[in-house]
């Protein structure tokens, strides 16, 4: 048997003692009925001229057809303007992070000699290129490329299968281990070499404390919640660290062949009907789920921090409703109305922010990595020539612009590597073999154009 507390009985007695024996009037209900009747009357009055006008326009088929054509033209123009607006906005949203990632890589390559020294190779590229024979070196680079692409293909298919069968915990654990390695071990190596290069003295406890704070905040921002800009900064940083590892441990010829092969693989994996990346994107769209933030750079919130803010706001409003003074009905009504208005405003603000968040453009971290590998290799192997590095940088941005243009036209997921990498390879070899010797000849003869 459930029994109310004594305080609740007292409140009920006080509440009932305030009510008279007569049936109270219901002004709010009657006013609402009158208001609705007035609205219906005014609505009918306003609609009468329109109905007569429509009756007059029905015989005139040309006028109605012209109006329909004008409305369709207006809608098409608005869609084109919206596409151009958000297309330009998306270009700017991607130019900044891609540029920052490449700048970090190039600055590190130019200043820290550790990442240009060849003292080992990746396990995925077992064939060495330390030979004078061009044919043997080319063969080894092709074999290394085949092994590397095969590993990427197998791991991608494995990831797609895990996602298809909803093995989310395994995927999260896999990504968390990768992020831990990047944010702690690779960051330690990077900071150690930077401090050695610039002769900065730091004791190990302080260094470990810095790395611990950096890695812990990064894990929280990437895999849980955090400010959008901080999450983006961490994604850019781990992409740069991974690119530096590839630049150091990939053989020179193998790196260029891998860049060409990975662009072809990206094209097939995204556009083929049974491509692994296409299946991953389609599965995520069917389930209406975001792809894991550790794999995708997003210019909009994926696990939005607004969710926490809205939950906090809802909690505050619930607390306001729970702390209503039941002894004052007028104050209770006003507080409930204020809470309802606040909730409506919060929902309207969230709904107004949702379209911008949905329009955010997303780019895979692999694209960041291979863009930076291309520019970093150009900076490391082009005899320190800035013309070649800048040419590759411009080529990647041009390819990214064209990719975003195609994205606005086709409105579906497209590979971001083929155009940019193709332009980058063309600009690299043409600048390194044609422009650089020409500039050196002009400089040796003290001729300036």
UniProtKB/Swiss-Prot annotation:
Residue ranges annotated as motif PAL: 415-417
SMART domains, per database record: PSN
Tissue expression from the record: Highest expression in ovaries and to a lesser extent in kidney, brain, eye and lung. Weak expression in testis, intestine, liver and heart. Present in trace amounts in skeletal muscle.
Lumenal side: 112-141, 191-203, 248-252, 384-389
Enzyme class: hydrolase
GO biological process, one term: protein processing
One Gene Ontology term of the molecular function aspect: aspartic endopeptidase activity, intramembrane cleaving
Membrane disposition: Multi-pass membrane protein
Intramembrane stretch boundaries: 415-435
TM region positions: 91-111, 142-162, 170-190, 204-224, 227-247, 253-273, 363-383, 390-410
Domain of life according to the entry: Eukaryota
Compartments where located: Endoplasmic reticulum membrane; Golgi apparatus membrane
Positions of the catalytic residues: 266, 367
Assembly behavior: Homodimer. Probable component of the gamma-secretase complex, a complex composed of a presenilin homodimer (PS-alpha or PS-beta), nicastrin (NCSTN), APH1 and PEN2.
Family assignment from sequence similarity: Belongs to the peptidase A22A family.
PANTHER family from the UniProt entry: PRESENILIN (PTHR10202), PRESENILIN-2 (PTHR10202:SF24)
Job of this protein: Probable catalytic subunit of the gamma-secretase complex, an endoprotease complex that catalyzes the intramembrane cleavage of integral membrane proteins such as Notch receptors. May play a role in negative regulation of apoptotic cascades during oogenesis and embryogenesis, and in developmentally matured tissues such as brain tissue.
Name of the protein described by the UniProt record: Presenilin-2
Source organism of this protein record: Xenopus laevis (African clawed frog)
Gene, per the UniProt record: psen2
């Amino acid at each position: 048997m459930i029994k109310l507390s004594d305080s609740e009985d007292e409140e009920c007695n006080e509440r009932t003692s305030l009510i008279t024996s007569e049936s109270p009037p219901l002004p709010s209900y009657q006013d609402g009925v009158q208001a609705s009747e007035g609205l219906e009357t005014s609505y009918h009055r306003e609609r009468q001229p329109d109905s007569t006008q429509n009756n007059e326009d029905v015989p005139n088929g040309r006028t109605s057809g012209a109006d329909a054509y004008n409305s369709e033209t207006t809608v098409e123009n608005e869609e084109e303007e919206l596409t151009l607006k958000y297309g330009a906005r998306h270009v700017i949203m991607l130019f900044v992070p891609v540029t920052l990632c490449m700048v970090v890589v190039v600055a590190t390559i130019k200043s820290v000699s550790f990442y240009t020294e060849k003292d080992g190779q990746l396990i995925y590229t077992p064939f060495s290129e330390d030979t004078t024979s061009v044919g043997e070196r080319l063969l080894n680079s092709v074999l290394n490329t085949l092994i590397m692409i095969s590993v990427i293909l197998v791991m991608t298919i494995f990831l797609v299968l895990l996602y298809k069968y909803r093995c989310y915990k395994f995927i999260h654990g896999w990504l968390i281990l990768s992020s831990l390695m990047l944010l702690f071990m690779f960051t330690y190596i990077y900071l150690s070499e930077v401090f050695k290069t610039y002769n900065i003295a730091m004791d190990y406890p302080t260094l470990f404390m810095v790395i611990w704070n950096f890695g812990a905040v990064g894990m929280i921002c990437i895999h849980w919640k955090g400010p959008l800009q901080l999450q983006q900064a961490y994604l850019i940083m781990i992409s740069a660290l991974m690119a530096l590892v590839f630049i150091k441990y990939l053989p020179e010829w193998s790196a260029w062949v891998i860049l060409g092969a990975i662009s072809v693989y990206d094209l097939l994996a995204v556009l083929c009907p049974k491509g692994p990346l296409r299946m991953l994107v389609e599965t995520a769209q069917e389930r209406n789920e975001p792809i894991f933030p550790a794999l995708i750079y997003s210019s909009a919130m994926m696990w939005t921090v607004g969710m926490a803010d809205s939950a906090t706001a809802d909690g505050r409003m619930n607390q306001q409703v729970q702390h209503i003074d039941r002894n004052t009905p007028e104050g209770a009504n006003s507080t409930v109305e204020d809470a309802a208005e606040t909730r409506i405003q919060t929902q309207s603000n969230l709904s107004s922010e949702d379209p911008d968040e949905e329009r955010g453009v997303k780019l895979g971290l692999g694209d960041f990595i291979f863009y930076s590998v291309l520019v970093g290799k150009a900076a490391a192997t082009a005899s320190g020539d800035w013309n070649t590095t800048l040419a590759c940088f411009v080529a990647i941005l041009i390819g990214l612009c064209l990719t975003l243009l195609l994205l606005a036209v086709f409105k579906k997921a497209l590979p971001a590597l083929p155009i940019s990498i193709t332009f980058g390879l063309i600009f690299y070899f043409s600048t390194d073999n044609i422009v650089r010797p020409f500039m050196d000849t002009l400089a040796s003869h003290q001729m300036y154009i």
